[in-house]
Amino acid sequence: MATIDLQKKSVKIVLEKKQLTKVTARVGLVLDITGSMRPLYKNGTVQNVVERILAVADQFDDNGLLDVWVYDNEFSRLKPVSEKDFSGYVDREILNNDRLHKFGRNDEPPVMKDVLRKYVTEEPSSYPAFIVFINDGGCKKSIKPIIEASSDKPVFWQFVGIGNGNFDFLNKLDTLEGRVIDNTNFLHIEEIDRISDDELYDALLAEFPFWLKEAKEKGIVREQEPPAEKPKKKGFFSRLFSK
């Protein structure tokens, strides 16, 4: 069985455990591409992250696509990745893309604003957005007003700190005041390529169900109706004897 199939199986188990199998959500991935991340892009770690989060999108997303952004002191909204074209995605769309700004310093607010622009302004939907935000430290406190302002929007920010950088501000997200509801979670994984798929997905989706429940109660996310069953086509004998 291919790796992506095993990852999808792991996601499905976690979704069943957290009673999320009937939930449809849009999934976005924001990747830190500052200078300190260069080795992780070069050694395949980031490609592996893309594939693992794609498995979440495949099980969770309304169209099976994973929306991707990269950011340093600039940001880019990249081509979404799917199960058909995930192989070599990082090399093709990022490392070999000369038009892409990369390996500069970090500046989170602009990319966060673009994420909200896409999911709230450009493509409003009854489906919530689940955003996995990868950062290797030094996340600016200037994201605070963006988190506060988006707390009444159908967007959940799952921050993932990798490595052993400074995550002081991200560690304080749970105590952040001035929000309609708690719309963030922070997960620190020092070596993301060493954590198992089961552990990763369980941790990534730990807080999302609680946010989703409260967001529905407050009318931020609308209740999703189950898809209507398509009428079954009658066979020849069924048509014959129904006359």
From Swiss-Prot:
Pfam families for this protein: vWA-TerF-like
The VWFA domain, residue ranges: 26-204
Transmembrane portions of the chain: none
Annotated segments matching region Disordered: 222-243
Residue ranges with Basic residues bias: 231-243
Domain of life: Bacteria
Protein name: Uncharacterized protein YcbR
Gene assigned in the entry: ycbR
